[in-house]
Amino acid sequence: MTECFLPPTSSPSEHRRVEHGSGLTRTPSSEEISPTKFPGLYRTGEPSPPHDILHEPPDVVSDDEKDHGKKKGKFKKKEKRTEGYAAFQEDSSGDEAESPSKMKRSKGIHVFKKPSFSKKKEKDFKIKEKPKEEKHKEEKHKEEKHKEKKSKDLTAADVVKQWKEKKKKKKPIQEPEVPQIDVPNLKPIFGIPLADAVERTMMYDGIRLPAVFRECIDYVEKYGMKCEGIYRVSGIKSKVDELKAAYDREESTNLEDYEPNTVASLLKQYLRDLPENLLTKELMPRFEEACGRTTETEKVQEFQRLLKELPECNYLLISWLIVHMDHVIAKELETKMNIQNISIVLSPTVQISNRVLYVFFTHVQELFGNVVLKQVMKPLRWSNMATMPTLPETQAGIKEEIRRQEFLLNCLHRDLQGGIKDLSKEERLWEVQRILTALKRKLREAKRQECETKIAQEIASLSKEDVSKEEMNENEEVINILLAQENEILTEQEELLAMEQFLRRQIASEKEEIERLRAEIAEIQSRQQHGRSETEEYSSESESESEDEEELQIILEDLQRQNEELEIKNNHLNQAIHEEREAIIELRVQLRLLQMQRAKAEQQAQEDEEPEWRGGAVQPPRDGVLEPKAAKEQPKAGKEPAKPSPSRDRKETSI
């Protein structure tokens, strides 16, 4: 007989063996050998899923039987004994069930079978492999249980850390798809048709030429006429690309920071990138034919006729270019550039043959005698808010600058209303509005000073002895001007006093709001201090406290920086609002003056239309009542109401 390790007699397996009819022992089923009865049989430390026989069909094999079949396959070669019971080294204790490391050590399982055990019974223990989907579900189920078990042992800091990691992972998934909006993107200035570049960058004076062309021409005319090899020597490529990118973005550039050769190379680059020939494809062969005429007179006449057929933009650009190059040739001693050199440089750039260029350069006066290169005056800038820009002193200069700023303002409005989102253009819009307000204010002051000086000169020229009625009639215009100025000053004073009262009320409400916010801040600070004292012990034990503090510090610095930027924007906005209020006051004053003048004119016209009735003794009946002539003088006396006195207003409202 072979040796067999049997369980105690009180175990249920012994009773089942006794009840069995044959003398052979049978292999225990998966229900008899389960992880709950024999915990040392399995390596895994996780509890097996509940096994419910009632809810399973008879043909389906349970999870415990599948696990048992896998384990039994490992020991299949070792089963050479007759008995099919497993002998354990020691009974598993409660400590082994808790620690998986101890359970791994308890692998000493000895299984004994009879050598005559049939292969048919072995097939009963073979398990069909699960489909991949079921395995995937089981793995997910186990992972979820493992996570639940871990979540019970986590601290608060670990929970916060896991929540942040989940949030970072979910962010790209949860972001909704933003619908694509077709934002109009402006094409660059270089490489677009000449007419489009003119429409986008034309200067305020109405000359239909691109801004980059005019600014380069002006710069070379001013600084490049003494530069040797101008247009022949190439500029620094990086500087040229930098200027090109700035003009493509329609940014204002200062060409005085660059060398003449760099600006000349930029001009050649612009002409080279033009998609169409300056003389057009249709007229270019005819210009070539005109060069073959026998006499110079015929050449000039044919060229004049062909130049008139060119589009306006093309004619202006070719005329300005030839006149400018003629100025360069005239300075041949300094520039070392003659007609041949200029033609060699310009011919491949503008795609015009040397024959045509030679005719242009030799007959500049006949072809372009009336062309004058007008210098570009850039609009005034107010880049630094701390300092006031230098405004023109004369009225003519102020009016010219106002026209430039208004043209620029219209261009900016056109671009922004077209759907182009550009923060630099929005800031430039505010800047132009501030400059316009300052210019209009200075223009009014200049007009007032001119009027005052004129009045003072006229008064000084008069002598007190020669004052007569005729002279008083001559000075009636001066008196009317003085009265109009007085009315304007008084109405302006009334508007300013009304604004003062409004601002005082606003300041009082703002002070109350400040006090309320201070009280809220103090209350929040006290709550924070109380909360910190309660959580000091917990925060000292947390491992991720330093990381949270660093993140909070970074967030705080970011918020402080954003707050500073918002304060700067707020100051700019307040200043703009203040300027707009001043402009509104001035408009109100003008409106009131116009209303007063209109009322006075209507009253005067009404008095002139009233005929004298009954020899002027009695006025015509009004509503059946006769009015004497003395009553006629009453509206005249009440025609001009009592004007407010500035000294009395100052006493009433202390500023």
From Swiss-Prot:
Organs and tissues of expression: Expressed ubiquitously but at low levels. Shows a strong expression in the erythrocytes.
Name of the gene: RALBP1
Segments for region (Mediates interaction with REPS1 and REPS2): 500-655
Consequence recorded when altering residue 74 to M: Loss of ATP-binding and transport-associated ATPase activity
Extra facts: Originally designated as dinitrophenyl S-glutathione (DNP-SG) ATPase due to its ability to stimulate ATP hydrolysis in the presence of DNP-SG.
Domain notes: The Rho-GAP domain mediates the GTPase activator activity toward CDC42.
Listed EC numbers: 7.6.2.2, 7.6.2.3
Membrane topology: Peripheral membrane protein
Nuclear localization signal: annotated span: 102-119
Region (Mediates association with membranes and could form transmembrane domains): 154-219
Primary localisation category: membrane
Record's GO cellular component terms: cytosol; membrane; mitochondrion; nuclear body; nucleoplasm; plasma membrane; spindle pole
Effect recorded for residue 425 to M: Loss of ATP-binding and transport-associated ATPase activity
Extent of Basic residues compositional bias: 69-79, 102-118
Protein name according to UniProt: RalA-binding protein 1
